[in-house]
Every structure is written in structure tokens, then in C-alpha cells.
């Protein structure tokens, strides 16, 4: 397993194993594996949560994930990968592609052009690209017939989905407002925050309207994925 994808989950209930893991990580201060704490105020004791906070202050992990939210969306048998990506236990993501919103905003003439032309155009291309990758993986690659993990029953094709990612919402909002000569900064002014919400609504509606037959575990839709940042 590549370092970037080596991940462990603890919680939501207190456990000896979870405590040992946090004690070891606080002492070692290593980067691998990444760790998430499934946190639920009704299941996670304050003492256990404080232990996790103390560990995070020393080694920047675990991250805290909203257990109730993930259970509501994916059921009890879910796991977390790379901090906050909820996926089915025994499943995974066929692919992860990203809308670089700041780049799309730079190529847009106005907020209206971004919303009604440039963003829909790029979303359509990315969705069709993801569909093609998924079709190849399932129908041609032989991965789910021949991979060791599938043969041994660790992963199942029908528990897989894909992640429709995005990065740079704040960049996009700030760029678009500047193009229109409107004052405002994402996260600081109401008009900028509202524009961000409108952009996310457009992306969410597109994703809900798009169907992929091999993403049946998530209702035939991709999962939206928010990227923290991107190098280029």
C-alpha cells in the first residue's frame, strides 16, 4: 500500500487497541499511517476524545470524522480513507478526478459565464472521462476477477464507487468577484460565501443527475470529494 493511502480508523467507542495506537503514534510522530477518529458525541467518551486531541497535537493525527453523518449516508459498514473520504467496507473508489475551480474561473468571462458555460462544460467532460475509466476497469482490465484482494474476498466490485472531486472553491469565488469588480472574499463576506454555495449547488445538482451503472452502492452516483489543495 502506498504511503498516501495507508490509513487506519479508530472509534467511535473507546477501545484498548485505539488507546495503544494513539500512544504509539504520539511517541513515534510518524507520517504513516494516516488515522481518523470516528467521533459521535453519544458514543465517544470525553476522555477518549481528549486522548485523540492530545495525540493530534503531537503528530497531527487522528483527524475527526462525523460518525453520525457517515452512518446516515453510507450505513454502519463504512471506512474512512485519507482523513475524510467515507467508502464502503470492502469497497473503494474506481477513480478520483478533480475540478480545478480556480482554473475554470480564470477562463471565464464573468460569473454568469462560469455558472452557465465553463463549469458545466468541464463537469460534463470529467464525468464522461470517469465513466470511461470505470467501464475499462470493470469490463476490460480483469482487476476484479484477478486481483488478490478480490479473490480473497477483501474487496467487492459492487461496493465500489468513484469520487467526483473539486479543489479551489475559494480561489474561484475570489477570482470571479474580481472579474466583476465586486468587493468580497470567500469566508469573509456574505456575498462571496453565497456565491460559493451557489457553485456547490450547481456541482451537486450535476452529480445527482449523472448516473453510472457501476456505482450502485452509492445510488448510481459519484461521491463528491473536496480536495484540501493541489500542487499545480
Predicted regions mapped to residue ranges:
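Conserved catalytic cores of very large enzyme subunits
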Residues: 1-158, 179, 185-193, 197-232
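Contiguous, well-ordered alpha-helical segments that form the cores/surfaces of helical PPI scaffolds
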Residues: 162-175, 201
Amino acid at each position: 500500500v502506498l504511503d498516501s493511502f495507508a490509513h487506519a480508523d479508530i472509534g467511535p467507542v473507546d477501545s484498548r487497541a485505539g488507546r495503544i495506537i494513539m500512544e504509539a503514534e504520539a511517541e513515534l510522530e510518524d507520517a504513516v499511517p494516516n488515522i481518523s477518529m470516528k467521533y459521535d458525541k453519544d458514543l465517544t467518551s470525553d476522555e477518549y476524545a481528549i486522548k485523540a486531541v492530545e495525540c493530534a497535537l503531537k503528530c497531527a493525527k487522528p483527524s475527526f470524522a462525523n460518525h453520525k453523518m457517515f452512518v446516515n449516508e453510507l450505513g454502519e459498514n463504512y471506512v474512512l480513507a485519507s482523513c475524510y473520504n467515507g467508502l464502503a467496507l470492502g469497497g473503494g473508489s474506481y477513480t478520483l478526478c478533480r475540478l480545478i475551480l480556480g482554473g475554470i474561473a480564470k477562463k471565464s468571462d464573468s460569473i454568469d459565464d462560469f455558472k452557465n458555460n465553463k463549469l458545466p462544460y468541464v463537469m460534463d467532460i470529467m464525468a464522461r472521462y470517469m465513466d470511461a475509466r470505470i467501464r475499462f476497469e470493470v469490463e476490460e482490465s480483469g482487476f476484479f476477477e484477478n486481483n488478490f484482494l478480490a479473490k480473497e474476498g477483501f474487496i467487492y466490485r459492487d461496493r465500489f464507487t468513484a469520487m467526483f472531486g473539486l479543489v479551489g472553491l475559494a480561489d474561484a469565488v475570489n477570482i470571479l468577484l474580481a472579474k466583476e469588480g465586486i468587493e468580497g472574499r470567500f469566508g469573509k463576506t456574505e456575498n462571496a460565501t453565497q456565491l460559493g454555495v451557489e457553485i456547490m449547488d450547481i456541482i451537486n445538482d450535476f452529480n445527482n443527475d449523472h448516473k453510472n451503472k457501476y456505482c450502485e452502492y452509492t445510488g448510481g452516483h459519484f461521491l463528491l470529494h473536496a480536495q484540501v489543495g493541489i500542487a499545480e
